[in-house]
Amino acid sequence: MLTRSKHGIYKPKAIQVQVDYTSQEPPSFSIASKHPQWVAAMDAEYQSLQKQETWSLVPLPPHKNIVTCKWVYKLKRHSDGSIARYKARLVARGYLQQFGMDYDETFSPVVKPATVRLLLALAVQFGWELRQLDVSNAFLHGILKEEVFMAQPQGYIDPAFPKHVCLLHKALYGLKQAPRAWFERFTTQLLHIGFCASTADGNLFILRHDSCIVFLLLYVDDIIITGNNSKFVTSIIKQLGMDFDLKDLGLLHYFLGLQIDYTSSGLFVHQTKYATDLIQKFGMTDCKPCKTPSSPNSHLLPNDSPLLSDPTPYRSLVGALQYLTFTRPDLSLAVQQACQHMSSPTHNHLQAAKRILRYLQGTLHFGIAFTPGPISLSAYSDSDWAGDPMDRRSLTGMVIFLGNSPISWSAKKQGTVSRSSTEAEYRALASTTAELYWIRMLLRDFGIFLPHPPLLWCDNVSALAIATNPVFHARTKHIEVDYHFVREKVLRRDVMLKFISTHDQLADLFTKSLPSPRFNWLTSKLMWKFPTRLRGDERHHNATSNGCPEHTNHEEEDGTPTARTPTATFHKTMSCSVIRKHKGRSKQNATVPH
């Protein structure tokens, strides 16, 4: 058999590229050990571990599970992207732990996004100073209850005892029970100095002393603290600093990827840097922006194209997009659709996820704003009946406002198949009512008692009739549980139901993939564009001409709720002036904390 000659065919030579790991995170210890900045960071981490007596060296015990560890490197950056410091962290390989031997309980709660947004809104309303705290090596404050043995860290093996292992006393990062141990340790100390946990969210802590009140919000080791007396807040920070290695980062500007900007109108919260980094990570920097995050009237179907050979990039992208919905309600529906195909993503699903990135490219500076005004709750509830062509389950969409500001929203598939559009709308009403009731409980923990029930706007007359008329018949008896729940809240005046036209239904944004004119109109009612004067480019022209945001709580001046349809409401503008104190806030519509 004749074969083709290999004359003139050569193996390509690998091109050696020098990577500057002083501006990038090294992937391994061998690379990091060649750069003095990262060596200094590892030395600082190791000394901190030794100072806190994280472990003691013991001979290798027989028949015990040994967990290894590794160094993880992170560049800590300022909100503008510049390098703040080099961080090296020793992390245990917790996936090597064995249940019942070296770990048991692992659950640790985190604060709900709506709680964060509500705290920011109330801080603007009452002029509370928002301060940010960070606990260095937070997990190391947690005390382990189980025996955990770990191999000595690479580069720091004791020459006198090279065969010994580390018996851990503190909850090192990476251990399965580390977050729980830290949460128990910190909350125990908070309760000791007088804080009490919110009944609505266990990560919100409240301290009342005479006329002073302090609110502390905990998200793992990141903390927001605020209150009506700055000196008293400072004293609490000093008291906590006596028990933990606490850093007072000053005024809140950057929290969990959220950028908080201060204007004369209040706060503007956005994730511009996070979105920019995400677009760059997936190589979409030069992509052409599109007007909507999903194609109008489109549905993502399983097995509609070949499966991805590696689903990891898709899952990583959708997970990152899911976090962007913290300040981007306009992404909720598109991300919800993408999340349904995590197990078996196809090429079409990946293209749909990349379309969201294209939409982000054109709307990088969008976010939500918190401005002072009358305190009232209003909500919008909608559903897309049998919208999923595969299982014919309906979709619930809702958005809840505190005054002018959206504080909670969602696009979620209903758990059961609805036999009629009325049933789907009624189940959406029940879900929105439950969320409203929870937010009202949260407001009470803040010391705020609303004089009027929240308004819940629905565009289905039949669903409203079921809620207000105690009549059962063959078509509604199977939704009896939801019926009793909503009916009870209406009778107790925990919520007031009102009809709204489909055109004015803001929750429509969360139930259907809309054409760009309708989508942009609804988005303009929920979101603001970052004041361009603060960015240094041309001024953004807002929808309103008078420069003042219109009321969104549908109340008359005396606070009495009305059935006025909000066709012209939610037109928002944001002043671009420098920071200054808010004056003349309206507080007449609620009993507020002092």
Model-identified regions with their sequence ranges:
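Metal/cofactor- and membrane transport-associated sequence elements
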Residues: 1-245
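Acidic, Ser/Thr-rich intrinsically disordered and amphipathic helical segments
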Residues: 28, 37, 41-44, 114-118, ...
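Alpha-helical coiled-coil heptad-repeat oligomerization segments
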Residues: 28, 34, 44-47, 51, ...
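Mobile genetic element proteins and their domesticated derivatives, centered on retroelements
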Residues: 4, 29, 42-45, 49, ...
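Structured nucleic-acid-interacting core domains from mobile-element enzymes and related host factors
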Residues: 61-67, 123-127, 359-383, 450
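C-terminal reverse transcriptase regions that engage the nucleic-acid substrate
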Residues: 114, 120, 172, 177, ...
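RNase H-like nuclease fold core
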Residues: 89, 93-95, 321, 380-422
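RNase H-like nuclease module associated with reverse transcription
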Residues: 254, 341, 374-376, 394, ...
